[in-house]
Amino acid sequence: MELMPLAHKLCSFNCVYCECGWNEPVSHPVLPTREEVKAALEKKLAVLSGQHSVLDVITFSGNGEPTLHPDFLGIIEDTCALRDRYYPSAKVSVLSNSTQLGRPDVVQALKMCDNRILKLDAATDTMMRRIDLPVNEGLTVKTLMERLGQFHGDFTLQTCFLRGEHDGQSIDNTTPEEVAAWYEAVDRLHPKQIMIYVIDRKTPEEHLEKIPREEMERIAAPLRAKGYDVIVSA
């Protein structure tokens, strides 16, 4: 499900690794209305149901940050209602960068979903800002952690591991110091699932390195030993 403009990315992060490219300055982004989203989804679900097609999950992601949509709560309410009508066993999932968790309506909407896949790319302010380039330059890991804590572990934590350089600054969230800080964050949040992955497509910053699977497995191992459910995509 795409709630952002089709012609350009709209996001509260400007991640160096984002497959959608860099943010573009847009004064008045045009978003689909709640009514348009509902109508399009109902039409699609009706067709799929009529064809007796299998539907496992309805996922919100796409060309930016879906929770930026001003009617995100209403859209999720509509989606859950339509899901219940057409595919009651299907899940509703949202991929989010966690920046809008200070909004009660967004938190309420996410709690209605079956799967909340929430990002934390680094557990230090310096590395988080170098990787994610938040539009709100004052955003801190402490703030993100506090807001993620609202879900009491009932979410999937998503982290992209990478190395490289951007604007003359080193980027590496795989150093012992960065990984140790991230482990501490994981233990504080205690998510029900952890998803760690590597860059796999063209990135806006060209000077980035894909982390080998063996290294990703080494990062995952101590968490698995503690009983965490860790998915490695590499």
Which residues fall in each region the model found?
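Canonical Radical SAM [4Fe-4S] cluster-binding loop centered on the CxxxCxxC motif
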Residues: 2-39
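Short glycine-centered, acidic/aromatic-flanked micro-motifs in structured strand/loop junctions
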Residues: 3, 60-62, 159, 198
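Amphipathic alpha-helical segments in well-structured domains
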Residues: 34, 76, 179, 212-217
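Short, well-ordered amphipathic alpha-helices
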Residues: 38-46, 75-82
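Short Fe-S-cluster ligation motifs
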Residues: 39-61
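Glycine-rich beta-strand-to-loop/alpha-helix junction loops that act as flexible
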Residues: 60-65, 97
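Conserved AdoMet/S-adenosylmethionine-binding subsite of the radical SAM
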Residues: 68-197, 202-209
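Binuclear metal-ion centers of metallo-dependent hydrolases, dominated by the metallo-beta-lactamase
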Residues: 212-234
